[in-house]
């Protein structure tokens, strides 16, 4: 038979013939792990001001090609920069950076 205190608190338990008071409390469900690691750095991305943007359009002082040992060239199209290089074995490598 059901515990009288439990039946008083939960009257529908009295309808169950096989109800017995649980001897151990139910196990707690563990808290799920976070989806992403906690962000340590609180820094925010800084937007460029109009003055800084106008300065970035100046011609770079970096050379656009190198010596014959490791030839490479730099080209720009809009907001993209491409670096073309070729190894001594003839392997061609292209690096494209979209700003």
From Swiss-Prot:
Post-translational modification: Phosphorylated by host ERK. The phosphorylation triggers a structural change that enhances keratin binding and protein stability.
Key words, A-Z: Early protein, Host cytoplasm, Host G2/M cell cycle arrest by virus, Host nucleus, Host-virus interaction, Modulation of host cell cycle by virus, Phosphoprotein
Subunit and interaction comment: Assembles into oligomeric complexes. Interacts with host CDK1. Interacts with host SRPK1; this interaction may favor expression of late viral transcripts. Interacts with host cytokeratin components KRT8 and KRT18.
Protein's name according to its UniProt entry: Protein E4
GO (cellular component) term, any one: host cell nucleus
Localization: Host cytoplasm; Host nucleus
BP term (GO), one: symbiont-mediated arrest of host cell cycle during G2/M transition
Organism: Human papillomavirus 31
Bias (Low complexity): 51-67
Family: Belongs to the papillomaviridae E4 protein family.
Chain intervals for the UniProt region annotation (Disordered): 48-67
InterPro entries: Papilloma_E4
UniProt keyword annotation of Phosphoprotein present: yes
Further comment found in the protein's record: The major E4 form is first synthesized as an E1^E4 fusion protein from spliced E1^E4 transcripts, such that the first few amino acids of the E4 protein are derived from the N terminus of E1.
Purpose of the protein: Contributes to multiple aspects of the viral life cycle including viral genome amplification, suppression of suprabasal cell differentiation and egress of newly formed virions. Induces host cell cycle arrest at the G2 phase by associating with and preventing the nuclear entry of host CDK1/cyclin B1 complexes. Inhibits cellular DNA replication by preventing loading of host replication licensing proteins MCM2 and MCM7 onto chromatin. Within the cytoplasm, associates with host kinase SRPK1, a splicing factor regulator, and inhibits its activity.
